[in-house]
Amino acid sequence: MLKVKLLQYTPEPEKTIAAAAKLCYSPVGVDDILENLTDEGAEKFLNMLMSYGHMSPIEHVSFTFAVEGVSRSLTHQLVRHRIASYSQQSQRYVKLDQFEYIVPPAIENDEVAKKLFIDQMQGAQKAYDEIVERLKDKYISEGIGEKPAEKKAIEDARYVFPNACETKIVFTMNARSLMNFFHHRCCDRAQWEIRTMAEKMVNEVKKVAPILFKNAGPSCVAGPCPEGKMCCGKLKEMRTLYLGK
């Protein structure tokens, strides 16, 4: 099951952004700015920044997520968002005695497709186990110790695992990169799995920075759809989902 947890974030993110932006136009230092910066003042200034499209100050705050129950297909898409830091469960160092896998809903709901899919997953596990044992025995016979032999075996045996293989990942993005991520991955044209994750992430960041992320979501939430002829035609539904109106 897909789980998203907001592990950490910059304390008082909206005040931090407002203070950083105000510093650009202030003769005093950040201590004086923060001392006189009320919640209402920070909100007003942040709204002004966002309305002007002045985005560089929001790079000062970051958000760290822990995600579980996702496929390697998802993480291959995720790491294309390059202004971020990623730490993913390793198939090289973690032996998968019984690997978990993600079944897409379209396959789950088709009895024949599901059987074909599960047969392939079970076949991959069987092949992995046999390759690990075969290579491990070979390396031991060559004089390599048992533990390093197993490690050497599993790093090659993992090549049989499919994109469906379940994985876990921790990643950090600054707010500007996160906004860009939401524009692309909350879009109806994004694949179902990463879109579901993005929706959960939006819900998490809105709890701690509601002003900053009030228009978070696909590009069409706060402006025109950039997809041209590929537009999904669901602008009204998307704005209802993300803005509640």
Swiss-Prot record:
The active site is at R185. Keywords: FAD, Flavoprotein, Methyltransferase, NADP, Nucleotide biosynthesis, Transferase. SUPFAM superfamilies: Thymidylate synthase-complementing protein Thy1 (SSF69796). Binds 4 FAD per tetramer. Each FAD binding site is formed by three monomers. It is an enzyme of class 2 (transferase). InterPro entries: Thymidylate_synthase_ThyX (IPR003669), Thymidylate_synthase_ThyX_sf (IPR036098). FAD binds at S56, R80, H81, R82, Q88, N174, A175, R176, N180. Signal peptide: none annotated. One of its GO terms (molecular function) is thymidylate synthase activity. It catalyses: dUMP + (6R)-5,10-methylene-5,6,7,8-tetrahydrofolate + NADPH + H(+) = dTMP + (6S)-5,6,7,8-tetrahydrofolate + NADP(+). The keyword Signal does not apply. Residues 2-219 form the ThyX domain. Its EC number is 2.1.1.148. Pathway: Pyrimidine metabolism; dTTP biosynthesis. CDD domains: ThyX. A motif (ThyX motif) lies at residues 80-90. Gene3D superfamilies: 3.30.1360.170. PANTHER family: FLAVIN-DEPENDENT THYMIDYLATE SYNTHASE (PTHR34934:SF1). Homotetramer. NCBIfam families: thyX (TIGR02170). Catalyzes the reductive methylation of 2'-deoxyuridine-5'-monophosphate (dUMP) to 2'-deoxythymidine-5'-monophosphate (dTMP) while utilizing 5,10-methylenetetrahydrofolate (mTHF) as the methyl donor, and NADPH and FADH(2) as the reductant. Belongs to the thymidylate synthase ThyX family. This is Flavin-dependent thymidylate synthase. It comes from Clostridium perfringens (strain 13 / Type A). The lineage of its organism: Bacteria, Bacillati, Bacillota, Clostridia, Eubacteriales. The gene is thyX.
